[in-house]
Amino acid sequence: LPITESFPEDSYSIDVVGKTIWIKGSGKGVLFAAYRYVRDIIGGRKWYAGHENTYIPKSTSLYVAADLKIFSKPSFQYREVYFPVELDQEYMDWYGLHYLEDKWGDWGHTASKILPPSIYFKSHPEYYSLFDGKRQPAQLCLSNEDVFTHTVVYFKRRMVENPKAIYWSIAANDDRGSCTCDRCQAIDKREGGPQGSLIHFVNRVAAIFPDKKFTTLAYLETANAPAHLCVADNVSVILSNIDAFRKNDITVESSAATFRRQLSAWKSKAKHVFVWDYLTQFTNYLAPFPIQGTMQKSLHYLKTQGVEGIFLQG
């Protein structure tokens, strides 16, 4: 089916009409509907990757309610559970999940992909952040016009190489060290921090490609929303809640109070907000960590706050 407002991407319906079972869907919706049928009607189960973790009951007869009507549309337009299990495409389809390489041309922290320090830092240190009184390759100088030009050229090339990609990330490296040059500081002082020069830069690049979708990361030094700037409509902000403890769901967890405030602020500045969440307890990676009691409440909260995409990192 065509993707519409009432039947968005990956939506589906299962209806019994007379003696016929009608399965309809948009995007991958038909496939997701087929697995829903296997789960809910046939009683199949898939606990993890691999056929050995899949159960399909054997029966000589199957009963389907004559008035069966199911309609389902995703709560989030992007849904990824970043575990090794995502290498099993059947598992991903069974639960209607995404894999970042199916959607992103460039994902995550991209500053060093756009201008690799190994190539440019020695000859053009001015492309990189002025930090602690000297140029360092920790981040880019986002007020440098040559950095802007290089970035535009980079994405033009990458979009030709990967024309099917939906999202393109423009984001700081996984580190601190944002630029403190006079030009960057002029923006950052007005906007409340390095998120100012980042959003100003991302908006400029996004304006060159109005028919493309970009993402950026609200994380570490850029976690707070800018004081005045709004985010371009073709840019999605991915906000991290890495500082929140995992004992309670994020609606009541005291250490998530900052995240809740940041989310509200970003929602007032950006049309599209995703969340980068974590399914682990950082104090001990190897300890068993049950999440069933908290994750559903957290996801429900994010949905009610208008979050459009979820990346759950294990």
Regions found by a protein language model. Give the residues of each.
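Generic recognition of flexible, low-complexity loop/linker segments
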Residues: 157-158, 224-226, 262-264, 297-300
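Aromatic-rich surface patch/π-platform used for binding flat ligands and interfaces
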Residues: 3-4, 302
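Substrate-binding cleft of secreted/luminal carbohydrate-active enzymes
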Residues: 284-314
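Low-complexity, flexible helical/coil segments
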Residues: 57-61, 250-254, 307-314
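Substrate-binding cleft/loops of secretory-pathway carbohydrate-active enzymes
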Residues: 215-243, 286-294
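Active-site-proximal structural scaffolding
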Residues: 74, 144, 198, 202, ...
